[in-house]
């Protein structure tokens, strides 16, 4: 057992580095070359692109994303959506569940998938047993199970042609200046793989690499093998090895996320 195991148990009961190390190592061994292969293939493939200068207003994104969240089942009579620097959700109690998102007027997917992710968390909170709130029976099973709900909605549902077929009328109504994309084109845009710096905006290929990077650094810090002062250097070095790009500033590296 290690000091880090104690903290892991707080978040996912019974899990240790002996469980995670081989899982992550095997996944990373395949993901790093897969990421390189996909990004190289995308350079020569005829991929749809976002037109330069196209603006997706904050109000239009809010309207579109609220419609998606409501269709997913979120009860706006027992919760609300707001804006914040970093998306998050908070289940204050079953009758008051809130989540936030952020807006980028040149990238509507950033807001959309943040909303779908946080709505997934919020739906789990709204679905807990109200009669047993404040007891184990009325609480989330674990953070891992909680995250499974958010990631399921964001990716298994949200990054499919079937999803885009359903929401296409709302997309066109809210963004009339966008090209006349069909559900397949929008799905290809939403599934583009990129070597990006920000975890919460990562695609399915790179997301787990972001998580593994944090895991490896956390192990070193809590086991006494890395000083906090050296964290940026360790982060940037590992990111370069796995993603093949340099982190230009800590705002895009170890300081990007309040719960990284």
Where are the regions a protein language model picked out?
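Active-site recognition of the HExxH zinc-binding catalytic motif
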Residues: 103, 110-130, 147-154
């Amino acid at each position: 057992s290690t000091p880090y195991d104690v903290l892991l148990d707080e978040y996912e009961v019974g899990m240790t580095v002996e469980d995670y190390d081989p899982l992550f190592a095997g996944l990373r061994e395949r993901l790093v070359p897969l990421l390189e292969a996909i990004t190289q293939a995308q350079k020569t493939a005829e991929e749809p692109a976002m037109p330069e200068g196209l603006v997706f207003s904050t109000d239009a994104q809010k309207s579109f994303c609220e419609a998606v969240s409501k269709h997913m089942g979120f009860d706006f009579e027992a919760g609300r959506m707001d804006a914040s620097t970093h998306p998050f959700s908070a289940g204050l109690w079953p009758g008051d569940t809130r989540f936030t998102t952020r807006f980028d007027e040149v990238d509507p997917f950033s807001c959309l998938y943040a909303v779908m992710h946080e709505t997934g968390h919020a739906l789990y909170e709204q679905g807990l047993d109200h009669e047993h709130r404040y007891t184990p029976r009325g609480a989330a099973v674990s953070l891992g199970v909680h995250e499974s709900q958010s990631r399921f909605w964001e990716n298994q549902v949200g990054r499919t042609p079937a999803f885009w077929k359903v929401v296409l009328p709302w997309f066109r109504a809210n963004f009339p200046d966008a090209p006349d994309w069909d559900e397949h084109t929008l799905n290809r845009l939403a599934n583009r793989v990129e070597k990006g710096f920000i975890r919460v905006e990562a695609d399915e290929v790179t997301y787990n690499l972001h998580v593994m990077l944090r895991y490896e650094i956390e192990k070193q810090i809590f086991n006494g093998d890395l000083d906090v002062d050296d964290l940026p250097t360790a982060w940037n070095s590992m990111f370069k090895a796995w993603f093949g790009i340099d982190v230009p500033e800590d705002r895009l590296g170890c300081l990007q996320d309040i719960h990284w």
